[in-house]
Every structure is written in structure tokens, then in C-alpha cells.
């Protein structure tokens, strides 16, 4: 059975009875086919029994929680079953060594830049960011790398804006709260992508709290933020572009809140449905010579990072060809 992500938008109760997990809400009680669940995303107010959590942990199923506004709150991360002390040592060494850390930080951003270029080409704009990549290669500090990344994104959003409908202009990238509909859509998709990357990291031997571009902090899986630099343009931005240009997402799917604009419940439902479909879409992998899902591409990227950390093969970021 092919496993899929489960999204819970309504309020309810998640509990275990014998060897079955049930979700109960105002519409009734429904058993969940646990063997077909990859991970769970909870947007409603959901109570969970300890027995259900124990069972989900045994099955290696991560749960990701989002607040009332659709932003990521945190994860229930089952005990890791894939351990490698050797990899942990190498992962930390690459953080502590300034040159090794800087190399990886640059590669994550270069991957993101090239995927932004590819998006613009698909949006009918042939702009190249080669001058930024040259500048990036000359950076000697992480803060300098982040500065270049910020300027590239500002230019990218400006160029992307030229192709967007009048009702869905970015104008200026704003967050928490986003100031218009397009900013709200981009932020919501980025917030959904981040825990999807966390799930993939859980299924590798990597330690998700040790990162290179983003500074490791308590209470966040910062390695997922590193990898998101590559996948935000490839998955979140491209999906946002399609949703507004095809009229799938409209003004009616948003609400004014907290001095900003947010997706309403119906808008969240529509976006999440399309996001899950997007993650399950397959592309023909040029090197593997077979079809892989976009979700799987994230796992493969993590495996490439493992090979770099243990000295098997230098990491090269994924650049979209599809």
C-alpha cells in the first residue's frame, strides 16, 4: 500500500482502541488505515490520547501541528530508529569547521537561486542571477551569504510579480502577518513544506537540529530550513503561481485578520488538497532513470547530504529540470 499524508482540518479527538486509530469529530467516528499513513498534519483543535501517540510512535509516524492561522507550531517526532554515531560526529564537524559549513551554506543558496531562475523561465522571464552566484562564491561569512540570498529573493519576487494577475501581486514580501493575498498564500505553502521536509529527515540518519546556513537553535529543526531553500521555489512558489493563474485560489478564499490577510478554512482546504497532490506527483529522475515523487526528491536530497558529510561524494544541490 502506498502511504499518503493525512490532513486533519476539523476539530476532534484522535484515539486508539485495540490496534486501530480513530478520529472522532462532529460528523462521527472514523477508523484510520494506519498502514497507509505516511505522516499527519493537524490544523484543527485535536485532542490526542496517549495510547494513540504511543501507537503512532511505534509505527514511526510523525505528527505536525499548525495554529489557528495555518502556521506551523511544532511536531511530535517519534524516537529515532535510524542511528549513526559516525554520521552525527561528521555532521557536527561540518558545522564547527568554518570552511566546511560555509561551503554547504553556499550550495543550499546556489540551489535555491538556480531553481528561482528556472521558475522565472517557466513564467516567461529569462533573467539570470549569475552575478549573485559570483558574489556568493566570494562570501567569507554566513551573514554575507544570507545577505546575498535576501537580495536575490527581492529581485526574484519583483520579476515574478510582473507575471502575476493584478489581484495577486506580491508587491513586497511580508510575513507574520502577510499584508496581501499572494503573501498569505506563499507563507502558508512554505509553512506546510517545512514539516514535510522534517518527515523526510526523520527517515534518514541525519540529525535535523544541526544545520549550516541557518543557525541551530533550540526548539526548531534548522536543517529542514536549509533544505527548504532548494524546495521552496521548486514546490511552494510554483504551486502558488499555478493556483492563482488558473483561478483555483480566488479572493473569496482569504480573510482579513491581525492587521494582515490569511487564508480562510475553505482556502486552506483547497491549497492543502493541491499541495498533497503536488507532493505525490512523479517526475522522471535523470540519474536514477525512473519516476520518483516530489516528496521522494526531498529524501534523495537528504541522502546526497549524508554522502557529502561522510566524504563519499561532494554535495550538489538539486536543480529542477521539470
From Swiss-Prot:
A Pfam family recorded for this sequence: Cas_Cas1
Major enzyme class: hydrolase
UniProt-recorded Gene Ontology molecular function terms: DNA binding; DNA endonuclease activity; metal ion binding
Record keywords: Antiviral defense, DNA-binding, Endonuclease, Hydrolase, Magnesium, Manganese, Metal-binding, Nuclease
Record: residues binding Mn(2+): 149, 214, 229
DNA-binding keyword on record: yes
Enzyme Commission designation: 3.1.-.-
Gene Ontology biological-process annotations: defense response to virus; maintenance of CRISPR repeat elements
Cofactor list: Mg(2+); Mn(2+)
Role this protein plays: CRISPR (clustered regularly interspaced short palindromic repeat), is an adaptive immune system that provides protection against mobile genetic elements (viruses, transposable elements and conjugative plasmids). CRISPR clusters contain spacers, sequences complementary to antecedent mobile elements, and target invading nucleic acids. CRISPR clusters are transcribed and processed into CRISPR RNA (crRNA). Acts as a dsDNA endonuclease. Involved in the integration of spacer DNA into the CRISPR cassette.
PANTHER family in UniProt: CRISPR-ASSOCIATED ENDONUCLEASE CAS1 (PTHR43219:SF2)
Subunit structure: Homodimer, forms a heterotetramer with a Cas2 homodimer.
Family per similarity comment: Belongs to the CRISPR-associated endonuclease Cas1 family.
Name used for this protein in its record: CRISPR-associated endonuclease Cas1
Amino acid at each position: 500500500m502506498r502511504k499518503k499524508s493525512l490532513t486533519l482540518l476539523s476539530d476532534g479527538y484522535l484515539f486508539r482502541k485495540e490496534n486501530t486509530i480513530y478520529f472522532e469529530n462532529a460528523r462521527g467516528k472514523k477508523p484510520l488505515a494506519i498502514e497507509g499513513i505516511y505522516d499527519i498534519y493537524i490544523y484543527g483543535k485535536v485532542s490526542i490520547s496517549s495510547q494513540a501517540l504511543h501507537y503512532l510512535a511505534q509505527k514511526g509516524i510523525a505528527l505536525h501541528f499548525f495554529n489557528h492561522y495555518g502556521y506551523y507550531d511544532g511536531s511530535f517526532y517519534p524516537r529515532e530508529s535510524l542511528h549513526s554515531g559516525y554520521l552525527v560526529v561528521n555532521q557536527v564537524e561540518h558545522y564547527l569547521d568554518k570552511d566546511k559549513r560555509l561551503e554547504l551554506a553556499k550550495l543550499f543558496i546556489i540551489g535555491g537561486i538556480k531553481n528561482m531562475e528556472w521558475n522565472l523561465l517557466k513564467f516567461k522571464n529569462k533573467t539570470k542571477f549569475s552575478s549573485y552566484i559570483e558574489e556568493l562564491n566570494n562570501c567569507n561569512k554566513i551573514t554575507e551569504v544570507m545577505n546575498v540570498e535576501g537580495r536575490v529573493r527581492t529581485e526574484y519576487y519583483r520579476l515574478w510579480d510582473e507575471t502575476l494577475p493584478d489581484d495577486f501581486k506580491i508587491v513586497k514580501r511580508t510575513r507574520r502577518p502577510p499584508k496581501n493575498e499572494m503573501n498569505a498564500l506563499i507563507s502558508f505553502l512554505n509553512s506546510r513544506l517545512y514539516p514535510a521536509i522534517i518527515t523526510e529527515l526523520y527517515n534518514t540518519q541525519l540529525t535535523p537540529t544541526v544545520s549550516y546556513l541557518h543557525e541551530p537553535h533550540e526548539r526548531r529543526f534548522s536543517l529542514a530550513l536549509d533544505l527548504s531553500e532548494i524546495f521552496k521555489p521548486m514546490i511552494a512558489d510554483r504551486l502558488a503561481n499555478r493556483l492563482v493563474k488558473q483561478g483555483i485560489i480566488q479572493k473569496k478564499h482569504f480573510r482579513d485578520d491581525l492587521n494582515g490577510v490569511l487564508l480562510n478554512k475553505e482556502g486552506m482546504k483547497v491549497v492543502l488538497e493541491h499541495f498533497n497532490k503536488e507532493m505525490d506527483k512523479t517526475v522522471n529522475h535523470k540519474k536514477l532513470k525512473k519516476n520518483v515523487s516530489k516528496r521522494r526528491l526531498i529524501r534523495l536530497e537528504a541522502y546526497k547530504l549524508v554522502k557529502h558529510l561522510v566524504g563519499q561524494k561532494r554535495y550538489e544541490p538539486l536543480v529542477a529540470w521539470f
